[in-house]
Amino acid sequence: MANTYTAVTKQDGGWWIGWIEEVPGVNCQERTHDELVASLRTTLAEAIELNRQDALGAAAPDYTEELVTV
């Protein structure tokens, strides 16, 4: 299931820096805009997976999963 997030990006000197608006701590810095977007995408996917593993580990062994829509 694909989700959409908002990347906030800006150029600062010779660097591009960016953040994922909806997820604290997901930020990157790269030399080009294309590299930045790719790096944000990878970092976001890793952050979501790590958070998922942490949540499941904390809730184990007995838990249920529910979808929540905002």
Predicted regions mapped to residue ranges:
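Short, charged, surface-exposed hinge/linker loops at domain edges
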Residues: 1-6, 34-70
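Intrinsically disordered, low-complexity regulatory regions of eukaryotic regulatory proteins
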Residues: 19, 28, 63-64
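ATP/adenylate-binding site constellation spanning eukaryotic-like Ser/Thr protein kinases
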Residues: 20-23, 41
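A short, exposed loop/beta-hairpin motif centered on an aromatic-Gly-Thr core
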Residues: 24-35
